[in-house]
Amino acid sequence: KPVTRTLQEMGYTNITVVKEQEQPDGHFPTCPYPNPEIKEAMALGMEYARKCNADLLLATDPDCDRVGIAVKNKAGEYELLTGNQTGMLLLDYICSQRIKHGKMPADPVMIKTIVTMDMGEQIAAHYGLRTVNVLTGFKFIGEQIGKLEQLGKADSYVSGSYVRDKDGVDGAYMICEMFSYYATQGISLLDRLDELYKTYGYCLNTLHSYEFDGSAGFARMQSIMQAFRGGIKEFGGKKVVRLLDYVQGLDGLPKSDVLKFLLENNCSLVVRPSGTEPKLKIYISVSAENKEMAEKVEDEIAKTAEKWIC
């Protein structure tokens, strides 16, 4: 309802709501896992989108702190964008519009987590933004906003400093504004994404999760983390250029059991235990000339990483 109200106040009138998912239900009967980042959770919404020929599909999770989107490709099929892809599009759009309208602050800052798109830093640098990397969790981003305010730089937060945690409503607002702007230019979000890839190179970001239940699983994760600290030289043929071990509290960040391997050719791998689930998570970021090459490189990196887990 907050998203619907926001869109209506923006002037959108042709809004279709998925009736089966309109009312809260903690059993989540319409999808296996209520995460808008996965295709299964968007399946019912995509059915609705096809029936009404929607231009844009938006979906939030139950507590409305995340938002996922799907847009039509040239074949007329709905394509789900990843959070990283949406983030790159929003970063580029907001920066370009702020410059266009003379509203870019003197010392602009992009705050992102260490597991988020490496390509974002290239986009930020193009627009003159300084990048601040923080640990996973929006509380760390909110903390940085507070520090910027103390320095008199509240405007450095591109969407506003009024939200200190993940907010799907604000995300939906910005996505719709961006979508509408590009529609007036005769291009789609996928078109703009392709333009970004042509400018900065193709970027692929993936997440691999491995479950380890119980106390034995926890001990196993601790053992795996120690193994990753054992001087690994390469992943998938990509040499390790530098290892960032955040258990030492790097760059003024709190100590955290997180490792980030900076690989050659602007690739990276992050491994960390989940803070909320009995899972070990591996984030892989690959830069390549095209999608096919990126997928091949990502697969090789993932295979090497799995050897240290399985």
Predicted region positions:
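Active-site pocket-lining segments that scaffold enzyme catalytic pockets across diverse folds
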Residues: 1-11
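Gly/Ser/Thr-rich active-site loops/lids in small-molecule metabolic enzymes
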Residues: 13-17, 77-95, 168-174
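Phosphate-binding and adjacent anionic-ligand microenvironments
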Residues: 50, 54-56, 60, 77-79, ...
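N-terminal small/polar loop signature for handling phosphorylated ligands or for N-terminal nucleophile
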Residues: 11-66
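Short, charged, surface-exposed secondary-structure boundary motifs
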Residues: 25-29, 91, 142-146
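Active/binding-pocket-proximal capping segment
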Residues: 9, 20-25, 139-141, 277-279
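Short Gly/Thr/Asp-enriched flexible loops that form oxyanion-binding sites at enzyme active sites
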Residues: 3-4, 65-84, 120
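Short, acidic/turn-prone active-site loops that include or flank metal/cofactor-
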Residues: 19-23, 83-87, 135-139
